[in-house]
């Protein structure tokens, strides 16, 4: 992998997927539009270290976070959000930061990403394995395609320090 790499975090199960989808469909107004793109929404679970009470409705995410803090290099969480891309939609070509040669600090964990991919300019398409975590070089122009009839759901975690991003 060149612009995207899997990192050794515990696998996150799909036990909360239906709850996440229900929360999204019933609580749509609680989700923020990301970068002015109508098909891409997010909900902050942890923001500036403050945890939303909604986290208690997602026990597999809670267990995963506890395991990560206990058994991995991920410690303090600065930001954690659910990211949802509508079925048969895309996040157009964009960059998230200026530096193109380093991995971003944020960790993307796939919850439901079947029949979707991230593609980087002058590179290939990367397909996330559900339950696994990845780092991307978000300074490289990229897009996300959801070819599925289902919501594409990921968890984006930004720790205060991410040693996985420093490893080549």
Where are these regions (language model features)?
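Short, conserved beta-strand element in jelly-roll/cupin
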Residues: 84-86, 99-116
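A short beta-loop-beta micro-motif enriched in histidine and acidic residues
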Residues: 76-77, 90-106
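Non-heme Fe(II)/2-oxoglutarate
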Residues: 1-74
């Amino acid at each position: 992998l060149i612009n995207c790499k899997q990192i050794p975090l515990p696998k996150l199960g799909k036990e909360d997927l239906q709850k996440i989808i229900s929360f999204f469909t019933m609580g749509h107004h609680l989700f923020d539009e990301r970068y002015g793109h109508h098909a891409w929404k997010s909900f902050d679970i942890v923001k500036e270290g403050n945890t939303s009470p909604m986290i208690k409705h997602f026990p597999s995410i809670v267990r995963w976070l506890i395991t990560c803090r206990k058994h991995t290099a991920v410690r303090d969480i600065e930001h954690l959000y659910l990211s949802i891309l509508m079925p048969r939609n895309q996040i157009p070509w964009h960059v998230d930061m200026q530096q193109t040669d380093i991995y971003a600090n944020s960790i993307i964990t796939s919850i439901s990403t079947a029949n979707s991919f991230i593609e980087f300019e002058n590179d290939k398409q990367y397909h996330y394995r559900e339950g696994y975590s990845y780092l991307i070089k978000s300074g490289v122009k990229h897009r996300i395609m959801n070819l599925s009839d289902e919501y594409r759901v990921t968890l984006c975690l930004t720790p205060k320090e991410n040693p996985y991003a420093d490893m080549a």
